[in-house]
Structure formats: structure tokens, C-alpha cells
Amino acid sequence: METQRNYPSLWRWGTLILGMLLICSVVGNLWVTVYYGVPVWKEAKTTLFCASDAKAYDTERHNVWATHACVPTDPNPQEMVLENVTETFNMWVNDMVEQMHTDIISLWDQSLKPCVKLTPLCVTLDCSSVNATNVTKSNNSTDINIGEIQEQRNCSFNVTTAIRDKNQKVHALFYRADIVQIDEGERNKSDNHYRLINCNTSVIKQACPKVSFEPIPIHYCAPAGFAILKCNGKKFNGTGPCTNVSTVQCTHGIRPVVSTQLLLNGSLAEVEEVIIRSKNITDNTKNIIVQLNEPVQINCTRTGNNTRKSIRIGPGQAFYATGDIIGDIRRAYCNISGKQWNETLHKVITKLGSYFDNKTIILQPPAGGDIEIITHSFNCGGEFFYCNTTKLFNSTWTNSSYTNDTYNSNSTEDITGNITLQCKIKQIVNMWQRVGQAMYAPPIRGNITCISNITGLILTFDRNNTNNVTFRPGGGDMRDNWRSELYKYKVVKIEPLGVAPTEARRRVVEREKRAVGMGAFFLGFLGAAGSTMGAASITLTVQARQLLSGIVQQQSNLLRAIQAQQHMLQLTVWGIKQLQARVLAVERYLKDQQLLGIWGCSGKLICTTNVPWNSSWSNKSLDEIWDNMTWMEWDKQINNYTDEIYRLLEVSQNQQEKNEQDLLALDKWANLWNWFSITNWLWYIRIFIMIVGGIIGLRIVFAVLSIVNRVRQGYSPLSLQTLIPNQRGPDRPREIEEEGGEQDRDRSIRLVNGFLPLVWEDLRNLCLFSYRRLRDLLSIVARTVELLGRRGWEALKLLGNLLLYWGQELKNSAISLLNTTAIAVAEGTDRIIELVQRAWRAILHIPRRIRQGFERALL
């Protein structure tokens, strides 16, 4: 009875605890949520395309930079400052530099591809000195060395005419540096026989007469899906973290000036001092790039009104050479303000001294090498100048001379007047992009003057001893020229897809989940062609991904084919890059949209899912994630688990689509109007026939059972119309008027006539039979549950009593063990103390025993 009274409270408390557990389990779960458009990026290498205002600078279509093929620049460029962002830059490992270097080489090669090869000019040249006509000298001609009248030679040679079997003798003017004397032996050596300098080392190609080398600013732009990060730190040295970061779509206009030693027409530092940039300032094998904060103007001139003439060197080929020199035959030269140069040099030396412990700094010209390295080489008005910079780099700066605000140095140059640099002009120019190839630059008519700004220097250094550091001008690797402008840029790939935990869960069609074998995800796109429709539907995600991969691979193959046939299609490098950029943008967009579609998130910026968040990915709370972390920090934390999360999203969406497909199969029951459709009438007739057949079958079964039952009782009805009373036991008398007794609740069983009464009677009997059996079954189940509950409760009580009993026994045993241990320890301690005391007394009694021994001995 006590147990039965405890049942209601037990069930009440059990239900309450179960509800609390369910609520806690629902509240505590986190689910993966997909976000599209998160501000996350990663370093990447991609194809950049160009933007330029070529028409604003030069209408000549044959400009070597082919900027007419670039897209127009944005009149309102957008630059977004990234607050609280620190990004690492490295100008020495920058794919933008390598890409620009490759582009400029391709442009030079393409511009010179259709030009004439000067192989027919590799003949013997009969040369003599040149006499100028109408020579006039200005008053300041003393600034320039006039004793250089042998700079050019008038050479005659035989060439093939339009008719191949006929030769013609022509003459042309060559610079002395472009020809070498032929050594035919000591006996037959002639001072008048020469050849072109590059005939035995490389193929010479003439620059087309319409090609212009005037640099035009080129803006490098990132395609859609990518961005260019820009460091706006004014003292940024090119490597390390930058805290002032912005994002742009295009760089500033970069003039691809090909020069050595001095950087021309570049960007300036925005601080009061020069900026020193080097991969390792202590490594003398690494170049040092100096960015000036103020420009130094350099004015270069080639005097003389030269003429140009065309010489036929074969069928369909023409060679352009200098005809006559009218005016001063002097070399070309450049002028630089001495005061301005020395002020700039003082800033450079002061900055270098801070890196080299204020040692004595020596500036010297290059020790040796090719003429392009030992001189300042550049292009001026179509002519290639090679200027001697010894006057610029020939001084010694002690610690006291550059740490003070003075410009004192051990130099013989006048720092107040102009510094004049002697220059040579070469028609045969070694190509800077590769070894073993040269170019013949046709002469330019008339006077040539170009004014440029020196915005940087390229230096090398060597340590003479512990007190001196020698710096020399360097260059030759044009990557340093591009690096001096691209130091503050880097290309990143925008990752708009992000996943994070939230408490929101997608409401889905629940269904028992089946395990999907991992092998299904590795089937090929066509590998499921022979599978069943059900098996192939599992690989739809893989097929969609591989379909896009096939498109991407096809586009890549097309681009490679176009690049291979670039010379046939007459496409510039910019055309190839624009095609690549546009295809790449489409591929990036399709890839993101493909993933969103696979996850069931098409067209959504925030998409909840049914994938539970695993704490092993990140065990941070929602407040720590959403209130204290940026998307970049969060992406770095879960980057190792992104692939796993993506896979689970695909599996979840596949299961959801399968459940929806199964639900649609039952969806026709949701619309009652469809029940009255004519197409369903045959189904209704079939169902009716099945019901009637079932009733008839049940009637037959019950009739057979009734007959069998009566036969077993030994009674047979006389007629189908006879009312058959139920049999009563001898202990149950019928009720009569005079006596009491049990009420007669029994009825006679009447056999009915007709189909409908028969159906009704059978249905009634069937329902009563089912009801009674179900009632009996429920009664049995209730009694069983009650019994199990009582037995379970008694077992729990017994288990509780056992736990209490054994807990008390363990407690008593522990107390007894502790007491025994304490007693044993106490007894042992007492014995140890007693032994120590005895030993101590024995030690104390040693002198007494010795004294007693002596006393006995004396007695």
C-alpha cells in the first residue's frame, strides 16, 4: 500500500525531470550557420589586368607598352580604409613584382616581334672618321668634353637589293661603341675594317621605326573576387606588419621605366626623410632600394639636328641609319643641380649611417661589369643613353659630416653649380630581359631633350673594414625597379563564405538518417552512369562539383592554347590578361554559388542549417565569438576544420532533399479535393471490392467458428429461424418472480436474413470482438506495467538500502583502518623516540665512562 501511494509523486517528479532535461538539451545546442559576404581574405596569386589612360598620353598606336589595349581608369577610384586591421606585407616575396616583370618582357618581345632582323648586316664594314657640317659651339661648351669627335664612324658595306643576286654598296653612320675592329692577323690587320659588336653573340633585331619607348602609367587591377591591399604607413619599409591598411581595386599609375642605378619618375616618400628598403640590410649581396622624399631633376640632351635615312637590305626589309650630322657632334650629356643632389645625398648618407653604426661611408662608382651596370642607362626620346655617374658617386662621408646639418664631404665636385654627366648613345642595345639578344634602335631625327625626376637609388655595398662601408650604384634586375613601386601592395583572395555557430536551427523534414558510404563521394562524374537511380542520386553533389571543375579546366586549357598562339592571333599580353581576369571572376562566382546551392542556401546571405556545432572545432561561447573576434581571427581558428564542416553541410542537405522527396510522395493525401478526382474512381472501386470481400470472408470465418463451437457442445439448431438461448451453468439459476437471483443479461443469438442485416451484424460482432480483445490486452499491459513498476521500485529501494549499508560499512572500515594506522604509527614513533633517547644518553655518558675507566686504571 505504501508503494502504491508513492506512485503518483514518483511519476510527477520523473516527468518534471525529463522535461527539464529536454529543455536543457535544446537550449544548449549550437548549430552551424552559413554567412555569405563575410570580410575574410587570404593571400593569393592571380592574374591582374591593366588600366591606363593611354590616349591621354600618346596617340601613337605602336607604343611598346600597348596601353591602348588596357581598360580605361576609374575616374573616381574607391579606397576603403580597414579599421583595426593589421596585415603583413613582404615586398621581396610579391607575385605582383614577378607578374609585372613577365608582362613588361612580353610587351617588349611582342613589340619587336614583327621588326626586321639585322642578320644581313653582319658583314665587313669599311669605316672612316665623320666630319660634321655647320658645327656651332655655344659659350658653355667648356662644360662638355669636345675631344670626342671620333664617337661616330662613317661605314660603307655591301647589301642585297630587292633582287637577291645583286648587291649594292651603301654607307651609314654607326656609333663607335656599336662596332668592333676585325682582327685578320698581324700582317693583314686593317684599321678600317669593322663589324657589328653583337654579330657573334646574339641575334640583332631592329626596333620598328614607329615603336615608342616613352613610359605610360599603368594601373594594375585585381579581377572580381580579389582585392589589392595597400599599406598606407608613411615609414613602412616594405616588410613586416602594417596597421594602416586599405583596400583598392587598382594600384596607382606605375611608369615602367627601364633604367639602372637611378630610379626615374617614380613615387616619393611622404615623410621628411628618405626610406631605406632591403631584404637584409646586413647582407652585402642584397640590393638596397632608396626612396627619396624630394625629387632631383635630371635634364638630358643630345644636340645636333641629325637626319635619318632608309637602306634596303633585302626584299621587303629596310634598315634605318643616321644620314648626316648637322651641328655639334659632341656626345649626349645630362645636367643635375649640384646643390640639390648633395642635399639629397646628405639625407641618404644620414639614413644609411643609422643602419651601419655611424661608420664612415664611402661612395664610389661601380667596380666593373657590363656597360648597362657601370653607367646610368635609360631611354630618352627613343635613344638609349649610357651616362657616366662617377661625379655623383665619388665622395667620402665621415661620422661628423653627416650627423650634423652640414653637407661637408671629401668630394672635388662643385656643390653649387650643375653636375654634368657624360653620356654615350648606342644603337645596338643588349636586351635587359634575357642574355644573348640585342636590338638595334633606329636613330632619331633632330635634337633630343628629356627632363626626368630622380626619385630613388639602387645601391650595393661592401665592407672594407670595421670602420668603413663602401656604397656603389647598382641595378640591372628590373624587378627592383618594379619593386620600388609595388612595395606597398599585395593581392588577396576574398573568401565570402563563412560558417559560425548560432542557436538558430533550420526547420527540416525529420526522417531516420541512413549512413552514406564515403565511397559514394569519390565516384567520378560519369562513374554513376551505370548505377541505379537511387544510387546515382547520392552523387549529385559530386557531379555538380565536378561539372564546374570541368568548366574551369576547359577554360584553363583554352587560355593556354590562346597563349601558345598569341603570335598568330596578334593579341597583346593585356588582352590575354583581361580574358583571364574575366573568366576567373566568373569561375569564382560560380564556385561560391555552387557551394551555396549544395548547402541549400541559394540566394541567402544568412542561412541556418541542421548541422550541430562540434565543440572540438571551437569551444568558445557565443559571446566570445560574436563580441570579441573578427571574421579574420575566426577564420584562422577554424580553418583546419572548414573542409569537414563543408562535408557535413552537404550530407545534411542531401538527407534533407531525400526527406522532402519522400514527403512529396505522400503529399497527395494532403489535398482532399484530389480524392474526388475521376482518375481515382477505379481505386475507390477496388478498395470497395476489397472491403466487401473482407467482410464476406470474416462472415464465413465466424460462421465456421460458430458451427465448430456448437458441434463441440453437442447441439445443432433445428432451423435457421430458431432462437438459440445461451447455455447457463447449473450454479446460475434463471430469475423468477418469487425468487431473487442474477439478472438475466444473456440474449439469444438470432440469425438474420438479408444481405444488409447480415453485413451489419457481422460488423457489429467484429467491432465488439475487437473492443473486448483490445480491452483485455490493455488490462494485461496495465497490470504488467504496474507489476514491473512495483518490482522496479522495490528493487530501487533495495539497491538504495544496499548502498547505504555498504557505505556505512566502508565508512566504519575506513575509520577502523585509520585508527589502527594511527595506533601503529604512535607505537612505532614512541619506540623510535625511545631508541633515539637511549642512543643520545649513551653518547652523553661516553665521557663519564671514559673518566670511570681512567679512575679504575689509576686505582
From Swiss-Prot:
The lineage of its organism: Viruses, Riboviria, Pararnavirae, Artverviricota, Revtraviricetes. Residues 127-154 are annotated as: V1. The chain crosses the membrane at residues 688-708. Keywords: AIDS, Apoptosis, Clathrin-mediated endocytosis of virus by host, Cleavage on pair of basic residues, Coiled coil, Disulfide bond, Fusion of virus membrane with host endosomal membrane, Fusion of virus membrane with host membrane, Glycoprotein, Host cell membrane, Host endosome, Host membrane, Host-virus interaction, Lipoprotein, Membrane, Palmitate, Signal, Transmembrane, Transmembrane helix, Viral attachment to host cell, Viral envelope protein, Viral immunoevasion, Viral penetration into host cytoplasm, Virion, Virus endocytosis by host, Virus entry into host cell. This is Envelope glycoprotein gp160. Residues 577-595 are annotated as: Immunosuppression. Residues 1-28 form the signal peptide. Pfam families: GP120, GP41. Residues 366-376 are annotated as: CD4-binding loop. Belongs to the HIV-1 env protein family. Residues 387-423 are annotated as: V4. Residues 155-199 are annotated as: V2.
